[in-house]
Amino acid sequence: FARNMMQVSFGGTGVWLSDGATNIMPVAPHRGDDLTPEQIAENRSTVHRAWKLHYDHCRHSLANAFYQGWDLHPGQLPTRYAAVFTFFLEGLDAASERLKNFVEKAAQATLVGDIFDDAATGQGLLNYFLRAINCGAVTEKEALDRTSITLDELRSGSFVKILKNRR
């Protein structure tokens, strides 16, 4: 509830919100060159469990529109990248179709499958692609190939400008 209230309170202000950190580190408990097979297995299990937790936290944050988070250990970077890339790539086909249809219909309300998009959704769809590009999940070319917008329109970052210039 508190996170949602914070998002509503700061929405549209330009303040970027960040979700909290995962404080379980992907660090093996046993060190040294002469580890037993059991210690090696425990090290692997401990690190994998921490990675899974961090990945799940990142995905939860992204699903709730927190696009920034804190990583406390370099060993968390692989799971951050995996979570961010997976988040954007899983939704890419649907977002591509929705943005393409919406722009081509000049901001008329559209229905794609069972998802209704209106003018307020256009900026969110554009932001989806901008964030996917910023994190490296897709390239500008891939975004352009999947939508009906131009490079200048994409880089403008403004759905209102896209529609205004197409009229």
Report each predicted region and the residues it spans.
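Expand to "…catalyze enediolate/carbanion chemistry for C-C bond making/breaking, isomerization
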Residues: 1-167
